């Protein structure tokens, strides 16, 4: 093994592994950046993240990696943090655990208030991202599609930083006022992130962007004598510094002079809009807008904040009407790299968010709930994102035509795995007898002590199949969307250990399940047209059998559809490339050896009514989040009200 750390580089990849298989060639081609945008077509299990890490080191470019969901973003964040321990690897996702946006449904005359649950830990990580981007050059940001939503102006964030240097004089009263203006709060008793205190000649600040250290600045009279980072628990000195920049405690900071200008501009826009409604003889809308906006203005004057403050972002940032909002991409100066992971899913999400936001807000504006300037607080359009792009790599096992077109057909393939495993053999069988044939296939897997994934189209089918397999003495479990992360991990571990020999699921078996013991994937109703059985989905499902040297896929279908044939042909093409490579280089495929994750089993106890209600609240909360995500706001409100009723019954609010 070879360590690849380069001590004189800005980005230092630290690993004991060297690129193998197709990785060296892919890294070389991607690092050349022959076109501004490129596609990395990487088969399942070929180590795409490791390839990207090597490109980051070769290019020495600050990087943003965008994933299509929080879970995948978290996985990428952990991987890159391990690969770049000396660099600032940051995590930038939405800080809402639950978010139901404000909305108005004109057809039913229903107004829906904004409702949200904020995750303070994620909020702190977002501030950490902005702080690193403002103070360092060696930054890798891993984010979700929330990265295209607005954030604080880069110039404002830098402008508000407090800079301390050993030997310089400072006015202590001014320091206190500045910290308060940065949204820090005085707390002489206990320091937590976003708090500070003076104890004699010592200033201690717990930064809003980290929980790893407290900044201690010792003064001699008005001169800085010492700057240290100390452990918040032990008070042990971690680092002694010559200088330090303390950034804002929150993502958004507005000084008083800017706030005064913003309030003046909001009043002016309000008057113009009220006049417009009155001229249209829409008096009710004019009155409603005046009431809501004046209430918000009073809060802004008193506290510098109001409910729905995001609707006034353009005024608070002193931006021009219809201007592009600030985003994390504006924090990059010069050349930088954007990596869009699982681009076949992420890119459509990025494309659709602008129009979804516009549609919702336009109703609020048209009916007098919000000022027209609310439209200027929005996600970037894809065209705006493209204007900010410098270098782009789209990463996917199944890239779409859109990515290939954007890259001018510059597609770099990574098909050979570091384990030299080849794509599985595909067999098509008639589905008339698919259940009995499946049982025979599962039993045959026992000879090699391997496992089986079965993917079906509906929940009912999954439940019925699971029950029938149990009756036939097959050790089977059903994995579905409502299973929690810990329970999911337990199921996978039990499958790997042999407690189960088969797992039945729907689309959850498509991506993200890395189980080397699975040698057989069975696809029911492969010939039914639709998204779950299109070419890309089928290739993703097929990839679940690519972790085992005995990998096979059985498609149950009465005829071979065009989408099936494309998936079969592409898999055969990849398999041929992989086998030719192995023959040329005398490589033998070997099943991945992956240690089992230890998870303490959960012992279930008899539940009281309160415990049952608490469990139901958690389940309802999931449904509420799903309804809000699908913009089914009426259903979300009904579920929320049901939750409130249950909370009253058990006498306290359950944290969900």
UniProtKB/Swiss-Prot annotation:
GO MF terms held by the record: ATP binding; ATP hydrolysis activity; DNA binding; excinuclease ABC activity
Residue ranges of domain Helicase C-terminal in the record: 434-596
Origin superkingdom: Bacteria
Keywords: ATP-binding, Cytoplasm, DNA damage, DNA excision, DNA repair, Excision nuclease, Nucleotide-binding, SOS response
Compartment list: Cytoplasm
Chain sites annotated for binding ATP: 42-49
Gene3D superfamilies reported in the protein's UniProt record: P-loop containing nucleotide triphosphate hydrolases, UVR domain
Motif (Beta-hairpin): 95-118
UniProt GO cellular component terms: cytoplasm; excinuclease repair complex
Protein family according to the UniProt entry: Belongs to the UvrB family.
UniProt function note: The UvrABC repair system catalyzes the recognition and processing of DNA lesions. A damage recognition complex composed of 2 UvrA and 2 UvrB subunits scans DNA for abnormalities. Upon binding of the UvrA(2)B(2) complex to a putative damaged site, the DNA wraps around one UvrB monomer. DNA wrap is dependent on ATP binding by UvrB and probably causes local melting of the DNA helix, facilitating insertion of UvrB beta-hairpin between the DNA strands. Then UvrB probes one DNA strand for the presence of a lesion.
Name the UniProt record assigns to this protein: UvrABC system protein B
Organism expressing this protein natively: Mycoplasma genitalium (strain ATCC 33530 / DSM 19775 / NCTC 10195 / G37)
């Amino acid at each position: 093994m070879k360590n690849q750390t380069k001590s004189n580089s800005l980005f230092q990849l630290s690993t004991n592994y060297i690129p193998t298989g197709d990785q060296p060639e892919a890294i070389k081609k991607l690092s050349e950046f022959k076109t501004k945008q490129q596609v990395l077509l990487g088969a399942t299990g070929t180590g795409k993240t490791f390839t990207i890490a090597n490109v980051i080191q070769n290019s020495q470019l600050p990087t943003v990696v965008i994933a299509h969901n929080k879970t995948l973003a978290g996985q990428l964040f952990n991987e890159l943090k391990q690969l770049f321990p000396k660099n600032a690897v940051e995590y930038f996702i939405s800080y809402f655990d639950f978010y139901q946006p404000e909305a108005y449904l004109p057809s039913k005359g229903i107004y829906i208030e904004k409702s949200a649950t904020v995750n303070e830990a994620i909020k702190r990580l977002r501030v950490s991202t902005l702080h690193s981007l403002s103070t360092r050059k060696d930054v890798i940001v891993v984010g979700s599609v929330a990265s295209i939503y607005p954030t604080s102006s880069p110039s404002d964030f830098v402008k508000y930083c407090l800079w301390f240097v050993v030997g310089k004089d400072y006015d202590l009263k001014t320091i206190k006022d500045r910290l308060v203006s940065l949204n820090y709060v005085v707390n002489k008793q206990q320091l937590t992130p976003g708090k500070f205190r003076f104890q004699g000649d010592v200033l201690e600040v717990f930064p809003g962007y980290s929980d790893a250290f407290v900044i201690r600045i010792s003064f001699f009279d008005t001169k800085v004598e010492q700057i240290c980072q100390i452990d918040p628990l032990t008070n042990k000195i971690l680092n002694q510094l010559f200088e330090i920049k303390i950034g804002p405690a929150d993502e958004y900071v507005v000084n008083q002079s800017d706030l005064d200008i913003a309030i003046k501009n909001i009043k002016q826009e309000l008057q113009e809009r009220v006049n417009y409604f009155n001229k249209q003889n829409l008096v009710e809308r004019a009155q409603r807008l005046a009431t809501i906006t004046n209430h918000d203005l009073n809060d802004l004057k008193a506290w510098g904040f109001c409910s729905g403050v995001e609707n006034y972002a353009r005024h608070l940032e002193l931006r021009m009407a219809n201007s592009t909002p600030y985003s994390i991409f504006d924090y990059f100066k010069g050349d930088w790299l954007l990596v869009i992971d699982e681009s076949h899913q992420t890119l459509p999400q990025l494309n659709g968010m602008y129009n979804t936001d516009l549609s919702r807000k336009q109703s609020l504006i048209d009916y007098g709930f919000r000022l027209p300037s609310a439209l200027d607080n929005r996600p970037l359009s894809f065209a705006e994102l493209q204007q900010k792009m410098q270098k782009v790599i789209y990463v996917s096992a199944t890239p779409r035509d859109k990515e290939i077109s954007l890259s001018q057909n510059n597609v770099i393939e990574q098909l050979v795995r570091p384990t030299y495993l080849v794509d599985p053999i595909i067999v098509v069988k008639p589905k008339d007898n698919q259940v009995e044939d499946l049982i025979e296939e599962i039993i045959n897997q026992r000879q090699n002590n391997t496992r089986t994934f079965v993917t079906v189209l509906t929940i009912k089918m999954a439940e019925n199949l699971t029950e029938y397999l149990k009756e036939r003495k097959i050790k089977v479990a059903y994995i579905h969307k409502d299973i929690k992360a810990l329970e999911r991990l337990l199921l996978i571990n039990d499958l790997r250990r042999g407690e189960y020999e088969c797992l039945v699921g729907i689309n959850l078996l498509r991506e993200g399940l890395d189980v080397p013991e699975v040698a057989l994937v069975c696809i029911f109703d492969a010939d039914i047209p639709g998204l779950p059985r299109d070419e890309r989905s089928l290739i993703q499902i097929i990839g679940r059998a690519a972790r085992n040297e005995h990998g096979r896929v059985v498609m149950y279908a009465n005829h071979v559809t065009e989408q099936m044939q494309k998936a079969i042909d592409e898999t055969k093409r990849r398999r041929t490339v992989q086998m030719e490579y192995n023959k040329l280089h005398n490589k033998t495929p070997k099943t991945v050896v992956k240690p089992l994750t230890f998870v303490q089993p959960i012992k279930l106890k008899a539940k009281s009514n309160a415990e049952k209600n608490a469990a139901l609240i958690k389940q309802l909360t999931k449904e509420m989040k799903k309804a809000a995500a699908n913009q089914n706001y009426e259903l979300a409100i009904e579920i929320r009200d049901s939750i409130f009723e249950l909370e009253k019954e058990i006498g306290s609010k359950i944290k969900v």
